[in-house]
A protein has these predicted regions:
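Short, structured beta/alpha segment
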Residues: 1-90, 262
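Residue-level signal for inorganic ion chemistry
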Residues: 30, 66, 88, 111, ...
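Long amphipathic alpha-helix in the N-terminal Rossmann-like dinucleotide-binding domain
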Residues: 49, 71-82, 96-121
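Generic non-transmembrane alpha-helical segments
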Residues: 72-83, 182, 186-192, 265, ...
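Proline-centered turn/helix-capping motifs that create local helix->coil transitions or kinks
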Residues: 112, 116-125, 305-312
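Rossmann-like NAD(P) dinucleotide-binding subdomain of oxidoreductase/dehydrogenase enzymes
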Residues: 123-263
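ALDH superfamily catalytic-core signature
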Residues: 227-319
Length: 319
């Protein structure tokens, strides 16, 4: 990855407006895997300007044209599959087997689903009363993604924007920028017009705030903490943007005494540990009927003790 200190704006890898940088660390060993540039208000302004300009033409493309681009995006994503998996192994410490089967594979699985959805989408529908329902692209979208499922979240935000004729600016988590920048290369190779997709790295207080407040961004999509989601909502309210949020929370499983305890507790504990316990829907709590509490405790302890921790570079089902 040669472009860690650059941003992808207007179809080109460009130098940032400022010289501020930060280290990207492998959390499994604290080794530095790269130095990434941090963006500023000026970088966001540059990205929004070209995204707004690109929207004028890209929003008028046909569904057939956008489907062809999505299919080419899938081809290039499959070609860069291992690069994406290895990037997430390093930047977030995901075991390589899981990085392939769950993390990188999400980029392809979600793409297949959105291709199917776009195929079925009727952009113009005549209602029973004679009215015409038109489905049109929203405009320029600001997309902010987290570090725990980097490509999964990028795919869930970027692909539907591209599929529906929107243009976008992506700010990935500053802790997992490498996979996002590889994905920018994928989009570039797939042949998307300049300015349709743009990437600016940076911290939320600077780049995220600039995006949420920008008058020419029509929609913000954010996945992350409740604290940051509140700020995105408040900042977006100044220009009455459409906002979608997926925020933090805890996800308890409820266990009653008539459940299959061996099966259900094993499933709960393993799901909690999946992705090293870093999934937003990890069942980190069990709400247990008192009559079976002691038995559940024994099963949970046994399953947890059997889970192994090892080097993410090694193949296997360890965490």
């Amino acid at each position: 990855m040669d472009n860690l200190k650059k941003f992808f704006i207007d179809g080109k890898w460009v130098e940032p407006a400022t010289s501020e940088t930060m280290k990207v660390l492998n959390p499994s060993n604290d080794e530095t895997i790269g130095i990434v540039a941090l963006g500023s208000d000026e970088d966001v302004n540059n990205a929004v300007k070209v995204a707004k300009r690109a929207f004028e033409t890209y929003s008028k493309t046909t569904k057939k044209d956008r489907l062809a681009l999505l299919k080419e995006l899938k081809f290039v994503t499959e070609k860069r599959f291992e690069d994406l998996a290895q990037a997430m192994r390093q930047e977030m410490g995901a075991p390589i087997s899981m990085a392939r089967s769950a993390q990188a594979d999400a980029a392809i699985g979600h793409l297949d689903s959105f291709i199917d959805a776009l195929n079925e989408l009727e952009e113009r529908t005549k209602l029973i009363n004679g009215d015409i329902l038109l489905k049109e692209p929203i405009g320029v979208c600001g997309l902010i993604t987290p570090w725990n499922w980097p490509i999964n979240q990028i795919a869930l935000k970027v692909i539907p924007a591209l599929a529906t004729g929107c243009t976008c600016i992506l700010k990935p988590s500053e802790h997992t920028p490498v996979s996002a920048m590889i994905y920018a290369e994928v989009i570039e190779e797939a042949g998307y017009p300049a300015g349709v997709f743009n990437l600016v790295n940076g911290v939320g207080d600077v780049v995220g705030t600039a995006m949420s407040k920008h008058k020419d961004i029509d929609m913000m999509s954010f996945t992350g903490s409740t604290r940051a989601g509140i700020l995105v909502t408040k900042d977006s309210a100044e220009t009455i943007k459409r906002v979608t949020l997926e925020l933090g929370g805890k996800s308890p499983n409820i266990v009653f005494s008539d459940a299959n305890l061996e099966r259900d507790i094993e499933y709960s504990v393993k799901e909690c540990m999946l992705n090293t316990g870093q999934s937003c829907d990890a069942p980190t709590r069990l709400l247990v009927e008192s009559s079976c509490y002691e038995e559940v405790l024994k099963i949970a302890k046994k399953v947890a003790e059997e889970i192994t921790i090892d080097d993410p570079e090694k193949e296997g089902d360890h965490i």
